[in-house]
UniProtKB/Swiss-Prot annotation:
Belongs to the PAP/fibrillin family. GO terms for cellular component: chloroplast; chloroplast thylakoid; chloroplast thylakoid membrane; cytosol; mitochondrion; plastid; plastoglobule; thylakoid. This is Probable plastid-lipid-associated protein 2, chloroplastic. It is found in: Plastid, Chloroplast, Plastoglobule. It comes from Arabidopsis thaliana (Mouse-ear cress). The modification Phosphothreonine is found at residue 61.
């Protein structure tokens, strides 16, 4: 008896169904993952099991929403990059101005324009509601406050210069400390004011100064003695008198340690100058721009920020 081998081939087709009511778009539809696969039972035909074709249902979606989201993300990235560029340009323009004292009128105009552009991109519209950003020590980099210029001027006290002006905010205790540090050949000293602040609006705080503090001088307690000094081209050997110089150095170190260990001098501030207000117009983790009485502007950089080391 002859044996006949029956070979049957079935084609498998995929049908894509799109609702006729779908909105007509100019771009081809974006296909999302298969939502369902319909399985039909096996059908027996003449003893041969036949599996019907599978029907895949694929949902089409408009690309408009996805495109809008991508566009918004690109614009946000560009905005951040522009803000960082403005910050760097501002810091670069402050170089050599001695906190504003030595700035020319052209440089002041350039700085003012950069400040205005940054203020328009303020990422923290309500600074007093973001106290964690305000908290910490801020170093003054620039000001237009003319009453501060006499302090910055060199030559008032010979060999003494303003080394640093800072403002430290403690948002937990609502306190502010303004400090000026002076540096000279023999050491450093500081004068500071302690104040309390109250929040008056999302951008404005009222400051009430309570106390002034004159810090204890931090004198240099060590002097490096060279092996020789050169006077008018002639080298003078100091080894024969090194013992005498060492004795003088020890005495100076003892005096310096005694003075530096004394407590600071505190004093009360006059009531008529004990209040002020401060408006923060730009704030992020690196830079703070504030405006005070009379429209004066202050640019401060957070301690530890890489912007302090251009």
């Amino acid at each position: 008896m002859a044996t006949v081998q029956l070979s049957t081939q079935f084609s498998c087709q995929t049908r894509v169904s799109i609702s006729p009511n779908s909105k007509s778009i100019s771009k081809p539809p974006f296909l999302v993952p298969v939502t369902s696969i319909i399985h039909r039972p096996m059908i027996s035909t003449g003893g041969i099991a036949v599996s019907p074709r599978r029907v895949f249902k694929v949902r089409a979606t408009d690309t408009g929403e996805i495109g809008s989201a991508l566009l918004a993300a690109e614009e946000a990235i560009e905005d951040v990059e522009e803000t960082e560029r403005l910050k760097r340009s501002l810091v670069d323009s402050l170089y050599g101005t001695d906190r504003g004292l030595s700035a020319s009128s052209e440089t002041r105009a350039e700085i003012g324009d950069l400040i205005t552009q940054l203020e328009s991109k303020n990422p923290t519209p309500a600074p007093t509601e973001a106290l964690f950003l305000l908290n910490g020590k801020w170093i003054l980099a620039y000001t237009s406050f003319v009453n501060l210029f006499p302090l910055l001027s060199r030559g008032i006290v010979p060999l003494i210069k303003v080394d640093e002006i800072s403002q430290t905010i403690d948002s937990d205790n609502f306190t502010v400390q303004n400090s000026v540090r002076f540096a000279g050949p023999l050491g450093t000293n500081s004068i500071s004011t302690n104040a309390k602040f109250e929040i008056r609006s999302p951008k404005r705080v009222q400051i009430k100064f309570e106390q002034g503090v004159i810090g204890t001088p931090q004198l240099t307690d060590s002097i490096e003695i060279p092996e020789y000094v050169e006077v008018l081209g002639q080298k003078i050997d100091l080894n024969p008198i090194r013992g005498l110089l060492t004795s003088v150095q020890d005495t100076a170190s003892s005096v310096a340690r005694t003075i530096s260990s004394q407590p600071p001098l505190k004093f009360s501030l006059p009531a008529d100058n004990a209040q002020s207000w401060l408006l923060t117009t730009y704030l992020d983790k690196d830079i703070r721009i504030s405006r005070g009485d009379g429209g004066s502007v202050f640019v401060l950089i957070k301690e530890g920020s890489p912007l302090l080391n251009p």
